[in-house]
Protein backbone atom coordinates (compact mmCIF):
# COMPACT_ATOMS: atom_id res chain seq x y z
CA UNK A 1 0.00 0.00 0.00
CA UNK A 2 1.42 3.35 -1.02
CA UNK A 3 1.88 5.82 1.81
CA UNK A 4 -0.14 8.99 1.75
CA UNK A 5 1.61 12.31 1.35
CA UNK A 6 -0.58 14.14 3.90
CA UNK A 7 -1.89 12.93 7.26
CA UNK A 8 -4.17 15.04 9.46
CA UNK A 9 -4.89 14.92 13.19
CA UNK A 10 -7.78 16.89 14.66
CA UNK A 11 -7.20 17.95 18.26
CA UNK A 12 -9.91 19.05 20.71
CA UNK A 13 -8.05 22.35 21.19
CA UNK A 14 -6.03 24.97 19.31
CA UNK A 15 -2.47 23.72 18.81
CA UNK A 16 0.49 25.99 19.53
CA UNK A 17 3.37 23.82 20.74
CA UNK A 18 4.65 21.33 18.14
CA UNK A 19 7.69 19.08 18.05
CA UNK A 20 8.70 16.10 15.99
CA UNK A 21 10.49 13.32 17.90
CA UNK A 22 14.09 12.90 16.75
CA UNK A 23 14.25 9.18 17.56
CA UNK A 24 14.72 6.96 14.53
CA UNK A 25 12.70 4.19 16.22
CA UNK A 26 9.70 6.54 16.73
CA UNK A 27 9.43 7.93 13.21
CA UNK A 28 5.90 9.38 13.27
CA UNK A 29 5.68 10.57 16.88
CA UNK A 30 4.99 14.22 17.72
CA UNK A 31 4.19 16.32 20.77
CA UNK A 32 1.51 18.99 20.56
CA UNK A 33 0.68 21.68 23.12
CA UNK A 34 -2.61 23.50 23.61
CA UNK A 35 -3.33 27.21 23.51
CA UNK A 36 -6.23 27.69 25.93
CA UNK A 37 -7.04 30.86 27.84
CA UNK A 38 -7.35 28.83 31.04
CA UNK A 39 -4.72 27.98 33.62
CA UNK A 40 -4.98 24.29 32.76
CA UNK A 41 -3.58 23.46 29.36
CA UNK A 42 -2.51 20.17 27.83
CA UNK A 43 0.31 18.44 25.99
CA UNK A 44 -0.38 15.24 24.07
CA UNK A 45 2.02 12.78 22.48
CA UNK A 46 0.56 11.46 19.25
CA UNK A 47 1.79 8.62 17.07
CA UNK A 48 0.77 7.68 13.54
CA UNK A 49 -0.63 4.16 13.42
CA UNK A 50 0.73 3.01 10.08
CA UNK A 51 -1.83 0.20 9.82
CA UNK A 52 -4.88 2.43 10.20
CA UNK A 53 -3.25 5.61 8.77
CA UNK A 54 -4.62 7.50 11.80
CA UNK A 55 -2.89 9.49 14.51
CA UNK A 56 -3.52 8.22 18.04
CA UNK A 57 -2.90 9.91 21.38
CA UNK A 58 -0.50 7.57 23.19
CA UNK A 59 -0.03 9.65 26.35
CA UNK A 60 -0.27 13.20 27.63
CA UNK A 61 -0.42 15.49 30.63
CA UNK A 62 -1.98 18.68 31.96
CA UNK A 63 0.26 21.75 31.77
CA UNK A 64 -0.07 25.02 33.70
CA UNK A 65 -0.62 27.83 31.17
CA UNK A 66 -0.11 27.27 27.45
CA UNK A 67 3.36 25.83 26.81
CA UNK A 68 5.37 28.43 24.91
CA UNK A 69 7.40 25.61 23.35
CA UNK A 70 7.59 21.81 23.36
CA UNK A 71 10.70 19.97 22.17
CA UNK A 72 11.90 16.38 22.22
CA UNK A 73 15.46 15.66 23.28
CA UNK A 74 17.78 15.53 20.23
CA UNK A 75 18.69 11.86 20.56
CA UNK A 76 18.30 9.98 17.29
CA UNK A 77 19.73 6.68 18.52
CA UNK A 78 17.86 6.46 21.85
CA UNK A 79 21.02 6.69 23.97
CA UNK A 80 19.35 8.86 26.61
CA UNK A 81 16.07 8.86 28.53
CA UNK A 82 13.05 9.59 26.32
CA UNK A 83 12.55 13.21 27.36
CA UNK A 84 10.21 16.00 26.30
CA UNK A 85 10.80 19.57 27.52
CA UNK A 86 8.21 22.33 27.86
CA UNK A 87 8.40 25.99 28.86
CA UNK A 88 5.81 28.32 30.32
CA UNK A 89 6.03 29.50 33.91
CA UNK A 90 9.01 27.12 34.33
CA UNK A 91 11.16 24.70 32.37
CA UNK A 92 9.86 21.17 32.84
CA UNK A 93 11.25 17.84 31.67
CA UNK A 94 8.88 14.93 31.12
CA UNK A 95 9.89 11.30 30.62
CA UNK A 96 8.00 8.81 28.47
CA UNK A 97 7.65 5.36 30.05
CA UNK A 98 9.19 2.31 28.41
CA UNK A 99 5.73 1.14 27.30
CA UNK A 100 5.23 4.48 25.43
CA UNK A 101 1.79 4.75 27.04
CA UNK A 102 2.71 6.91 30.03
CA UNK A 103 4.60 10.16 30.58
CA UNK A 104 5.53 11.70 33.92
CA UNK A 105 7.18 14.86 35.20
CA UNK A 106 10.88 14.16 35.67
CA UNK A 107 12.05 17.58 36.83
CA UNK A 108 10.98 21.19 37.23
CA UNK A 109 14.00 23.46 36.85
CA UNK A 110 14.09 26.70 38.81
CA UNK A 111 16.88 29.17 39.23
CA UNK A 112 17.64 29.84 42.88
CA UNK A 113 19.26 33.15 41.91
CA UNK A 114 15.88 34.70 41.02
CA UNK A 115 13.26 35.34 43.67
CA UNK A 116 10.28 35.35 41.33
CA UNK A 117 9.61 33.42 38.17
CA UNK A 118 9.24 35.42 34.97
CA UNK A 119 7.59 33.49 32.14
CA UNK A 120 9.89 31.66 29.75
CA UNK A 121 9.27 32.58 26.13
CA UNK A 122 11.22 29.80 24.42
CA UNK A 123 14.17 27.41 24.64
CA UNK A 124 16.53 25.31 22.56
CA UNK A 125 18.17 21.97 23.22
CA UNK A 126 21.80 21.53 22.25
CA UNK A 127 22.11 18.79 19.62
CA UNK A 128 25.83 18.18 20.19
CA UNK A 129 25.50 17.91 23.99
CA UNK A 130 21.88 17.22 25.02
CA UNK A 131 22.72 17.85 28.67
CA UNK A 132 22.68 21.56 27.70
CA UNK A 133 19.42 23.46 27.29
CA UNK A 134 19.00 27.24 26.94
CA UNK A 135 15.88 29.20 27.94
CA UNK A 136 14.83 32.77 27.13
CA UNK A 137 12.67 34.88 29.41
CA UNK A 138 10.60 38.04 29.30
CA UNK A 139 12.75 39.34 32.19
CA UNK A 140 15.54 40.10 29.60
CA UNK A 141 17.64 37.08 30.62
CA UNK A 142 18.76 33.83 29.05
CA UNK A 143 19.73 30.82 31.15
CA UNK A 144 21.88 27.84 30.19
CA UNK A 145 20.87 24.70 32.09
CA UNK A 146 22.56 21.41 32.75
CA UNK A 147 19.54 19.13 32.71
CA UNK A 148 21.47 16.24 34.27
CA UNK A 149 22.21 18.19 37.46
CA UNK A 150 19.06 20.32 37.21
CA UNK A 151 21.21 23.40 37.83
CA UNK A 152 21.61 26.65 35.92
CA UNK A 153 25.15 26.80 34.52
CA UNK A 154 24.88 30.49 33.79
CA UNK A 155 22.30 33.25 33.53
CA UNK A 156 22.93 36.46 31.63
CA UNK A 157 21.09 39.65 30.79
CA UNK A 158 20.87 39.21 27.04
CA UNK A 159 18.73 42.13 25.85
CA UNK A 160 17.36 45.51 26.89
CA UNK A 161 13.79 44.21 26.78
CA UNK A 162 12.00 40.85 26.71
CA UNK A 163 13.81 37.94 25.04
CA UNK A 164 11.46 36.07 22.71
CA UNK A 165 13.58 33.23 21.29
CA UNK A 166 16.93 31.50 21.62
CA UNK A 167 18.83 29.00 19.46
CA UNK A 168 22.10 27.11 19.59
CA UNK A 169 24.44 26.92 16.63
CA UNK A 170 26.00 23.60 15.66
CA UNK A 171 28.46 22.63 18.39
CA UNK A 172 28.27 23.55 22.06
CA UNK A 173 29.60 27.10 22.29
CA UNK A 174 27.56 29.57 20.25
CA UNK A 175 23.96 30.60 20.77
CA UNK A 176 21.86 33.57 19.70
CA UNK A 177 18.73 35.32 20.90
CA UNK A 178 16.16 37.80 19.65
CA UNK A 179 13.83 40.10 21.49
CA UNK A 180 11.57 43.09 21.89
CA UNK A 181 14.51 45.49 21.49
CA UNK A 182 14.71 44.49 17.81
CA UNK A 183 18.17 42.95 17.99
CA UNK A 184 19.62 39.54 17.22
CA UNK A 185 22.62 38.91 19.46
CA UNK A 186 25.20 36.14 19.35
CA UNK A 187 26.92 34.77 22.46
CA UNK A 188 29.82 32.40 23.10
CA UNK A 189 29.65 30.26 26.24
CA UNK A 190 33.46 30.44 26.50
CA UNK A 191 33.29 34.23 26.89
CA UNK A 192 29.98 35.62 28.10
CA UNK A 193 31.38 39.08 28.89
CA UNK A 194 30.67 40.11 25.31
CA UNK A 195 27.94 39.59 22.76
CA UNK A 196 27.85 40.45 19.07
CA UNK A 197 24.87 42.27 17.60
CA UNK A 198 24.33 40.47 14.29
CA UNK A 199 21.28 42.49 13.26
CA UNK A 200 19.02 45.29 14.45
CA UNK A 201 15.67 46.07 12.88
CA UNK A 202 15.01 49.56 11.55
CA UNK A 203 13.12 51.50 14.24
CA UNK A 204 13.63 48.58 16.66
CA UNK A 205 10.65 46.47 15.62
CA UNK A 206 10.66 43.36 17.85
CA UNK A 207 12.18 40.15 16.49
CA UNK A 208 10.05 37.16 17.47
CA UNK A 209 11.82 34.00 16.25
CA UNK A 210 15.17 32.82 15.07
CA UNK A 211 16.45 29.59 13.61
CA UNK A 212 20.08 28.60 13.12
CA UNK A 213 21.13 26.69 10.01
CA UNK A 214 22.67 23.49 11.41
CA UNK A 215 24.30 22.47 8.12
CA UNK A 216 25.95 25.85 7.51
CA UNK A 217 26.24 27.67 10.84
CA UNK A 218 27.13 30.96 9.15
CA UNK A 219 23.42 31.47 8.44
CA UNK A 220 20.50 32.40 10.65
CA UNK A 221 16.90 33.24 9.86
CA UNK A 222 14.68 35.58 11.85
CA UNK A 223 11.24 37.20 11.64
CA UNK A 224 9.89 40.54 12.83
CA UNK A 225 6.64 41.06 14.66
CA UNK A 226 3.65 41.25 12.26
CA UNK A 227 5.90 41.07 9.20
CA UNK A 228 5.35 38.98 6.05
CA UNK A 229 9.07 38.75 5.28
CA UNK A 230 11.82 36.44 6.50
CA UNK A 231 15.30 37.84 7.08
CA UNK A 232 18.33 35.65 6.29
CA UNK A 233 21.54 36.72 8.05
CA UNK A 234 25.19 35.79 7.55
CA UNK A 235 27.12 36.12 10.83
CA UNK A 236 30.27 36.99 8.83
CA UNK A 237 28.52 40.12 7.52
CA UNK A 238 26.61 41.58 10.48
CA UNK A 239 23.85 44.19 10.23
CA UNK A 240 22.96 43.64 6.54
CA UNK A 241 20.56 40.83 5.59
CA UNK A 242 22.07 38.26 3.23
CA UNK A 243 18.58 37.83 1.75
CA UNK A 244 14.98 38.73 2.40
CA UNK A 245 12.24 36.26 1.53
CA UNK A 246 9.22 38.25 0.42
CA UNK A 247 6.25 36.19 -0.76
CA UNK A 248 3.92 35.69 2.21
CA UNK A 249 0.91 38.01 2.29
CA UNK A 250 0.54 38.13 6.10
CA UNK A 251 2.67 37.80 9.22
CA UNK A 252 5.14 34.91 9.29
CA UNK A 253 4.74 32.77 12.41
CA UNK A 254 7.40 30.10 12.07
CA UNK A 255 10.67 29.26 10.32
CA UNK A 256 12.70 26.07 10.13
CA UNK A 257 15.86 25.25 8.21
CA UNK A 258 15.97 21.83 6.61
CA UNK A 259 17.76 19.46 8.99
CA UNK A 260 19.61 17.79 6.10
CA UNK A 261 20.30 20.63 3.65
CA UNK A 262 22.07 23.97 4.09
CA UNK A 263 20.07 25.79 1.43
CA UNK A 264 16.43 24.94 2.17
CA UNK A 265 14.13 26.65 4.65
CA UNK A 266 10.40 26.37 5.39
CA UNK A 267 8.26 29.33 6.45
CA UNK A 268 4.62 29.42 7.64
CA UNK A 269 2.27 32.36 7.92
CA UNK A 270 -1.12 33.81 8.75
CA UNK A 271 -1.74 33.74 4.97
CA UNK A 272 -2.38 29.96 5.45
CA UNK A 273 0.68 29.08 3.37
CA UNK A 274 3.68 26.88 4.09
CA UNK A 275 6.54 27.69 1.71
CA UNK A 276 9.81 25.89 1.08
CA UNK A 277 12.61 28.05 -0.30
CA UNK A 278 15.82 27.14 -2.10
CA UNK A 279 18.54 29.62 -1.12
CA UNK A 280 21.35 28.08 -3.18
CA UNK A 281 21.43 31.06 -5.56
CA UNK A 282 22.31 33.59 -2.83
CA UNK A 283 23.53 36.33 -2.93
CA UNK A 284 21.21 36.78 -5.91
CA UNK A 285 17.71 37.79 -4.75
CA UNK A 286 15.36 34.88 -4.04
CA UNK A 287 12.15 35.72 -5.88
CA UNK A 288 9.83 32.75 -5.42
CA UNK A 289 9.51 29.71 -3.18
CA UNK A 290 10.31 26.23 -4.44
CA UNK A 291 7.13 24.63 -3.03
CA UNK A 292 3.83 26.03 -1.76
CA UNK A 293 1.20 24.35 0.39
CA UNK A 294 -2.13 25.94 1.27
CA UNK A 295 -3.71 25.03 4.60
CA UNK A 296 -7.29 25.71 5.69
CA UNK A 297 -6.39 28.36 8.29
CA UNK A 298 -3.56 30.53 9.58
CA UNK A 299 -0.52 28.33 10.26
CA UNK A 300 0.82 28.91 13.77
CA UNK A 301 3.75 26.54 13.95
CA UNK A 302 5.94 24.07 12.10
CA UNK A 303 8.42 21.30 12.84
CA UNK A 304 10.73 19.66 10.28
CA UNK A 305 11.55 16.04 11.10
CA UNK A 306 15.26 15.48 11.67
CA UNK A 307 14.95 11.69 11.52
CA UNK A 308 12.90 11.72 8.29
CA UNK A 309 13.71 14.99 6.54
CA UNK A 310 11.11 14.47 3.81
CA UNK A 311 8.33 15.18 6.36
CA UNK A 312 7.22 18.55 7.76
CA UNK A 313 4.52 19.08 10.40
CA UNK A 314 2.35 22.20 10.51
CA UNK A 315 -0.31 23.31 12.99
CA UNK A 316 -3.30 25.48 12.12
CA UNK A 317 -6.26 26.07 14.42
CA UNK A 318 -6.90 22.68 16.08
CA UNK A 319 -5.40 20.65 13.24
CA UNK A 320 -2.00 19.09 12.80
CA UNK A 321 -0.87 18.00 9.35
CA UNK A 322 2.26 16.20 8.31
CA UNK A 323 3.30 16.79 4.71
CA UNK A 324 5.70 14.78 2.59
CA UNK A 325 7.90 17.19 0.65
From Swiss-Prot:
UniProt entry keywords in alphabetical sequence: Repeat, WD repeat
Per-repeat ranges for WD: 62-104, 115-155, 158-197, 247-287
Source species, domain of life: Eukaryota
Family matches, as PANTHER family: WD REPEAT CONTAINING PROTEIN (PTHR19919)
Natural source organism: Dictyostelium discoideum
UniProt record similarity statement: Belongs to the WD repeat DCAF7 family.
Gene this protein is translated from: wdr68
Protein name according to UniProt: DDB1- and CUL4-associated factor 7 homolog
Organism lineage: Eukaryota, Amoebozoa, Evosea, Eumycetozoa, Dictyostelia
SUPFAM superfamilies per the UniProt record, alphabetical: WD40 repeat-like
Amino acid sequence: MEKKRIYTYNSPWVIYGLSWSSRVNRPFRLAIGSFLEDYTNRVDVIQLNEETDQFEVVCGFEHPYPPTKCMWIPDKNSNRPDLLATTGDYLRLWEVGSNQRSIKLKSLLTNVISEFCAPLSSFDWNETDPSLLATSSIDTTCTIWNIETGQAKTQLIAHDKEVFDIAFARGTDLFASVGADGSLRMFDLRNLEHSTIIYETPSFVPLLRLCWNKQDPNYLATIQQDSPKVIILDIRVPSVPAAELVFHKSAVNGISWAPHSSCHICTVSDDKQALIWDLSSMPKPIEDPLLTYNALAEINQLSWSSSQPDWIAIAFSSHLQILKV
